């Protein structure tokens, strides 16, 4: 049996829509072992699909298929702390767990880049799947089946605080709220801030983060789906947050704070 620990992720980070993400200290732990049948359970008694529709199983089988290996079944034991449909990369975490677990069971025929490419190809969001694999702060894009990515060190003086509401918001619904055409000015607005965000996090220019997490492409359309979302962002900043934004498609909100201010915020 192998164990895979995968972190939650926060994608977009305001200005970096579909391109920037960071791993958080909230984890799913998944145990996998080969079996002659499918045996899937959850340690906490939560409902999980117990057949071939289980995402972890599907992704594990994809690895076996890619490597030309037969798979009769798997034992999968899930211990998941990442809440589903809250904008914290729960689907990416399951995708990565299935791929990495199967790869470990097979003796790691896929190298790290192949794992990253396959996860993004299956999941469709390299800004979630890449930091889920590499950890830390990542910039990533998927092109022709290959993920071009950079893992960048983050200045050590900050923490990330996550506000997780008690309601769900599907990625499909959040994406449906977005316009099909964007204004050139809005594109430039985000491009400048995404570059500033990456540079500021890595150099410690923390005074830039409020501006750098600004966004015109997705948050203005999604706040209407998140009760009190804009109020939470405003209040977090009033209490000293350096920046705040919708995590992924929402509805969770993330605030960037100085280390030591986490409990206060």
Task: Describe each region flagged by the PLM.
Residues 1-86, 100, 104, 108-110:
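ATP-binding N-lobe of GHMP and related small-molecule kinases
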Residues 18-21, 120-130, 147-153, 198, ...:
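A generic local secondary-structure boundary/capping motif
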Residues 26, 36, 136, 164-169, ...:
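Glycine-rich beta-alpha junction loops
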Residues 164-224:
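Active-site rim beta-loop-alpha module in soluble metabolic enzymes
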Residues 70-148:
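Gly/Ser-rich oxyanion-binding loop with an adjacent helix/lid
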Residues 201-265:
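Glycine-rich, charge-dense phosphate/pyrophosphate-binding loop(s)
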Residues 34, 165, 255-259:
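Short beta-strand-to-loop capping motifs
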């Amino acid at each position: 049996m192998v164990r895979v620990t995968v972190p939650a992720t926060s994608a977009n980070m305001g200005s970096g829509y579909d391109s920037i993400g960071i791993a958080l200290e909230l984890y799913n732990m998944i145990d996998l072992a080969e079996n002659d049948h499918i045996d899937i359970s959850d340690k906490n008694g939560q409902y999980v699909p117990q057949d071939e529709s289980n995402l972890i199983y599907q992704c594990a089988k994809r690895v076996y298929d890619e490597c030309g290996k037969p798979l009769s079944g798997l034992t999968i034991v899930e211990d998941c702390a990442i809440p589903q449909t809250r904008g914290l990369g729960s689907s990416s975490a399951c995708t990565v767990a299935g791929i990495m677990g199967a790869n470990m069971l097979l003796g790691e025929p896929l190298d790290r880049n192949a794992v990253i490419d396959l996860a993004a190809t299956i999941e469709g969001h390299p800004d979630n799947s890449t930091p889920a694999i590499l950890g830390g702060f990542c910039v990533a894009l998927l092109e022709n089946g290959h993920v071009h990515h950079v893992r960048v060190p983050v200045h050590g003086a900050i923490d990330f605080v996550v506000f997780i509401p008690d309601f769900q918001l599907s990625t499909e619904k959040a994406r449906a709220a977005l316009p099909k055409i964007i204004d050139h000015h809005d594109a430039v607005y985000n491009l400048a801030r995404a570059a500033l965000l990456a540079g500021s996090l890595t150099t410690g220019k923390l005074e830039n983060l409020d501006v750098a997490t600004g966004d015109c492409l997705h948050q203005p359309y999604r706040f209407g789906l998140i009760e009190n979302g804009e109020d939470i962002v405003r209040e977090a900043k009033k209490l000293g947050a350096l920046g705040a934004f919708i995590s992924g498609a929402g509805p969770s909100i993330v605030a960037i704070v100085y280390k030591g201010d986490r409990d206060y915020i």
